[in-house]
Amino acid sequence: MRSAQVYRWQIPMDAGVVLRDRRLKTRDGLYVRLCDGEREGWGEISPLPGFSQETLEEAQAALLDWVNGWLQGQSTLPEVPSVAFGVSCALAEAAGTLPEAADYRAAPLCTGDPDDLVLQLADMPGEKVAKIKVGLYEAVRDGMVVNLLLEAVPDLHLRLDANRAWTPLKAQQFAKYVNPDYRARIAFLEEPCKTRDDSRAFARETGIAIAWDESLREDDFVFAAEAGVSAVVIKPTLTGSLEKVREQVQAAHTLGLTAVISSSIESSLGLTQLARIAAWLTPQTIPGLDTLSLMQTQQVRRWPGSALPCVSDDALERLL
């Protein structure tokens, strides 16, 4: 006997969360809970404004349509990426095919005063991997901050994300302020320039490795081993079904590229599932999941060690 519930939710964000020049005041999304006999599974559907191709309203319509079909015995996954991801997670949980083991390590997202960051990063236990968003301020300032951190913490490796913010000139201004001796400790810089060709040229000219992120979701993207490209950053909410995520990880690994499972600012429920996916598909790589601190609450499932209050499903708006 099949049954299903669909919930809609909204989480207040901390002030100062800006995506593509838009302030994100709340994170809005949906949960689906699927029950099949004694088995149940949850999934999160939360399109990311400015990044997802679908709106929340479009995702909601696609989800409700799919759930009604599933209750009648249909099984084809929806095509809308965030819905395909959430539904496939719920189905995998119900079927017992999403492993419980999780990788709760998170490359911390560094913001704030650089001097404070040096102290925090120096005290980090284990493998020191951290992430910095660049391209929000002046490229020269970004270069100076990155150089300062790499100089002050000799065993630190940084992941940088520019979200295609720079012109070739600005990218070069950034690189000019990073000591060539430290550049090998930049694990990768995600999409420094507006075009792939400009990003490739940046990698060639500076020796700073780059990673593809937005490119993975473009129709003409092909996985290939290229000089200067070290990684791909896979955001499942933007990618689609678990099977598609798995195919992309496999394609990257076959070419010797690092695959990083990364957050699209999901709620704690979605983040804990991403931690499980990372432990399953990319066990050697610290995932990029340090986004819960941007929110004011957790929901349904807790992230281990987080002091944020957790809202139960009883408090969510039920649509079905």
Curated annotation (Swiss-Prot):
SUPFAM superfamilies linked to this entry: Enolase C-terminal domain-like, Enolase N-terminal domain-like
Enzyme class, broadest EC rank: lyase
Biochemical pathway: Quinol/quinone metabolism; 1,4-dihydroxy-2-naphthoate biosynthesis; 1,4-dihydroxy-2-naphthoate from chorismate: step 4/7; Quinol/quinone metabolism; menaquinone biosynthesis
InterPro entries: Enolase-like_C_sf (IPR036849), Enolase-like_N (IPR029017), Enolase_C-like (IPR029065), Mandelate_racemase_C (IPR013342), OSB_synthase_MenC1 (IPR010196), OSBS_N (IPR041338)
Amino acids binding Mg(2+): D161, E190, D213
Family: Belongs to the mandelate racemase/muconate lactonizing enzyme family. MenC type 1 subfamily.
Function statement: Converts 2-succinyl-6-hydroxy-2,4-cyclohexadiene-1-carboxylate (SHCHC) to 2-succinylbenzoate (OSB).
Protein name: o-succinylbenzoate synthase
The organism's taxonomic lineage, starting at the top: Bacteria, Pseudomonadati, Pseudomonadota, Gammaproteobacteria, Enterobacterales
